[in-house]
Amino acid sequence: MLQQDSNDDTEDVSLFDAEEETTNRPRKAKIRHPVASFFHLFFRVSAIIVYLLCELLSSSFITCMVTIILLLSCDFWAVKNVTGRLMVGLRWWNHIDEDGKSHWVFESRKESSQENKTVSEAESRIFWLGLIACPVLWVIFAFSALFSFRVKWLAVVIMGVVLQGANLYGYIRCKVGSRKNLTSMATSYFGKQFLRQNTGDDQTS
């Protein structure tokens, strides 16, 4: 079902077409997609390692910069198009309609029952840990480069923040839905808390 946010032209939809829906499997702790899990971490961790060791590995700033940007670009593509879909059943993308208007679409695979899960808990932990931790490190690198006046590295670090931050934002939107859904979730939560508190007060009195 499509839910369109009129404020920012985004859509929250069920994940993929019918032909991409695989048979539901029990949620297990084991890693079901080892290759995807490896490359989910490989490019982003490699970019961080090269950034930290670049002055020791090479005296050429251009070589280090190009290597880091290539790793960040490969990571952005792999996480956006492959690992999110396989590891956690999420995907985000953009499409332009017939009127030339751009729409952002955030997809999530809906599981039919609590017993039949398609997402491995181990893969989910790997996915979200890598997705959150690496952008945080790039933000730290950005402040470090700024305060140490390493201006030439600032552009590279900002590239890391932007590319990995974009994937983080996109997958958070896939996970929790649009701002409208967030508002309704918050309203529902506080409403339940208020009702529970009033019910408890009535029982004690």
Curated annotation (Swiss-Prot):
- In its keyword annotation, does this UniProt entry include Coiled coil? no
Q: Transmembrane region positions? A: 34-53, 54-72, 126-146, 152-172
The record, for Pfam families, names: DUF846 (PF05832)
Q: Which gene encodes it?
A: TVP23B
Q: Which GO terms describe its cellular component?
A: Golgi membrane
Membrane topology, as annotated, equals: Multi-pass membrane protein
N-acetylmethionine modified-residue sites? 1
| Protein name per UniProt | Golgi apparatus membrane protein TVP23 homolog B
Question: What does the UniProt keyword field contain?
Answer: Acetylation, Membrane, Transmembrane, Transmembrane helix
InterPro entries according to UniProt: TVP23-like (IPR008564)
The subcellular location is:
Membrane
An example Gene Ontology biological process: protein secretion
For region Disordered, the annotated ranges are: 1-21
* Primary location group: membrane
Q: Which domain of life is it from?
A: Eukaryota
**What family does the Swiss-Prot or TrEMBL record give for this protein?**
Belongs to the TVP23 family.
Question: Where does this protein come from, organism-wise?
Answer: Pongo abelii
Keyword Transmembrane in the entry? The reply is yes
